[in-house]
Amino acid sequence: KLTEVAPFTVDLLLPSGAENLNYVLYTDESPYKMQREWLDRLPFDIYSVNVHTGAKRLIGRSYRTAPKWSVNGKWAVMYDPIAQVWNKFDGATGKVVNISDAIGYPMFMESYDKPAPAPAYGIAGWTADGNNVFLYDAYDWWKIDLTGERQPECLTKGYGRKHGKSIRKMTSNIDKDVFQKDEKVIVSLWDKDTMDEGVYQLDMKGRLRKLMEGNYVYTIHRFSDNHEYCVWNRQNVSEFRDLWWSKSDFSNPVKVTNANPQQA
């Protein structure tokens, strides 16, 4: 027996292990195609479909970002830009459940001033077992138990909000979306008042360790293959973004370029 899961004109969203699910998702932008003339990116609707019967159900309208499946393929996490909440979709039951209201803080960019729904602050990553997702608010990381057994937990223990600093994962050649229990993540702490930035190490118990900090904006370019060394730069209004070399914990830094000496 063949069952149509989705029309050929839509985007089917399948996780790894999809053969074990009862429900999957697809997105359909066809209701919004007339808006292509004035929108950079078309919104889309999200449907769930029973893979056994082909029965389809509309579960989200006018989305801007596609759902993301957990690494174990059991749940899809998706941000509803109209309701301004995060939901989870259960691939076994087809149910959609709000997972962010219990946090108590906005999960969307409150100062967003473009003619479109405010986007979410985003997803920081997942635990290796796929049962938890880490979401950003304006300042901190929140650990959400997708099994529903535990309430949301502020991984960073409110440090970011208390000190007015936004804690975000830094981009590099070794950054990850999936974190082991002993993972240590390189994050930036950006002060919204002074614009100063710090580079810290965050572990999965929420402990922060300062690596470097100052009146700069930092960018990590690359860690060495053995993860012992790093190339990065820092800059501010009076210092050009020269390259620096250091150990992977940013100790013993050495300036390796002098590209714009007249700025000093």
Short names for language-model regions:
Residues 1, 42-53, 88-94, 143, ...:
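Beta-propeller blade signature
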